[in-house]
From Swiss-Prot:
This is DNA polymerase IV. It is found in: Cytoplasm. GO terms for molecular function: damaged DNA binding; DNA-directed DNA polymerase activity; magnesium ion binding. It comes from Clostridioides difficile (strain 630) (Peptoclostridium difficile). InterPro entries: DNA/RNA_pol_sf (IPR043502), DNA_pol_Y-fam_lit_finger_sf (IPR036775), DNA_pol_Y-fam_little_finger (IPR017961), DNA_polymerase-Y (IPR050116), DNApol_IV (IPR022880), IMS_HHH_1 (IPR053848), Rev_trsase/Diguanyl_cyclase (IPR043128), UmuC (IPR001126). GO terms for biological process: DNA-templated DNA replication; error-prone translesion synthesis; SOS response.
Length: 365
């Protein structure tokens, strides 16, 4: 069966850190970490490729990153600058097609099956877009080209930085069969561990499971895994896709009591990550949810609806503290923590809203 869609996934290379290196020549070639101060409880938003050589990655506690590379340069995020650069990059995309689906400030899908330049080759379009981005904003990007979103997304990550990878219909199945399942887009840590425990290491191993087996193990997600293992993805590029929530969660390396200091430290990191993802998505949120899974696998959630939209770390952390106070101490230890913010709105619509702290001050006067 011949597919006729031409999909490109563009992913900027270490976007925030690359902008900092571009704007400050003294940082070029040095390990740069964008995120919180290592002396506080901040986390890494992103880091340069020089820093990644030390095993540093996003969402890592800044203190851990500092221990791995003490001479790294820590830089506070400049989201207004990142947003401005992102808008210039999107303008480049729109020269080629209106079918652009931004996933965040630094990545997007493009459907160039029919394009404004009347260029038949999607590979040539990807090359031109990469050249345009480098010439106009001074940054490198990586591109994945294929006949669906799933494969294009995987391809863009294969030859970073400044890479271009093509997955054709002819080589897709062979490529997927050899690919480790943890490299499949959308397969997170929990799913990856479940597959590993079942002895499933590659796409071929996954393809050997039938639909009934996958749905029995992964419920609704099983059908998606069944299709992805066969290179099937019918999702369209959606220019007006609405994101419903932003969240972060982690399965703990060892069980903890709810009132332990380490539990609070993990919540600090989760709130930092949610804050980072909110700003990256250019959103405000109005409903906070705390998720807790106990050692016996029972799960509870606590939610809080705010009067005003928020996107700042202090506001998110304060709200989570309020939710935590409503969790009963039941003697059971925690094995998973999660923080989600929903009821989202565009920043443009809510820019003048006051913060949670300002609101609390106003009702106390």
């Amino acid at each position: 069966m011949k597919h006729y869609r031409k999909i490109i996934h563009i992913d900027m290379d270490a976007f925030y850190a690359s902008i900092e290196q571009r704007d400050n020549k003294k940082l070029k070639g040095r390990p740069v970490i964008v995120g919180g101060n290592p002396q506080s409880r901040g986390v890494v938003a992103t880091c340069s490729y020089e820093a990644r050589k030390f095993g540093i990655h996003s969402a890592m506690p800044s203190a851990v990153a500092y221990n791995r590379c003490p001479y790294a340069v820590f830089v506070r995020p400049r989201f207004d600058v990142y947003k401005s650069v992102s808008e210039k990059i999107r303008d480049i995309f729109y020269r080629y097609t209106d079918l652009v689906e931004p996933l965040s400030l630094d990545e997007a899908y493009l459907d160039v099956t029919k394009n404004k330049k009347n260029i038949d080759s999607s590979i040539e379009i990807a090359k031109q877009i990469k050249k345009d981005i480098f010439r106009e904003v001074g940054l490198t990007s990586s591109a994945g080209v294929s006949y669906n979103k799933f494969l294009a997304k995987i391809a863009s990550d294969l030859r970073k930085p400044n890479g271009l990878t093509v997955i054709t219909e002819e080589n897709a199945q062979d490529f997927l069969d050899k690919l480790p399942v943890n490299k499949f887009f959308g397969v997170g840590k929990v799913t990856s561990n479940t597959l590993k425990n079942l002895g499933i290491k590659t796409g071929y191993d996954l393809r050997c499971l039938n639909l009934f087996e996958l749905e029995n193990i992964f419920k609704k997600r099983g059908y998606e895994l069944y299709k992805f293992a066969r290179g099937i993805d019918d999702r369209p590029v959606e220019p007006n896709r609405v994101r419903k929530s932003v969240g972060a969660e982690t399965t703990l390396s060892h069980n903890l009591d709810i009132d332990e200091e380490e539990t609070r430290n993990i919540l600090d990191e989760l709130c930092e990550e949610v804050c980072h993802r909110l700003k990256n998505s250019e959103k405000f949120g109005k409903t906070l949810t705390l998720k807790i899974k106990y050692e016996d696998f029972t799960k509870i959630t606590r939610s809080l609806s705010l009067e005003h939209y928020i996107d700042e770390y202090n506001d998110i952390r304060s709200g989570v503290d309020n939710l935590l106070r409503n969790v009963e101490v039941n003697g059971k230890q925690i094995r998973l923590l999660g923080v989600t913010i929903s009821n989202l709105s565009d920043k443009k619509e809510t820019y003048k809203d006051i913060t949670l702290f300002e609101y609390m001050d106003s009702i106390q006067m």
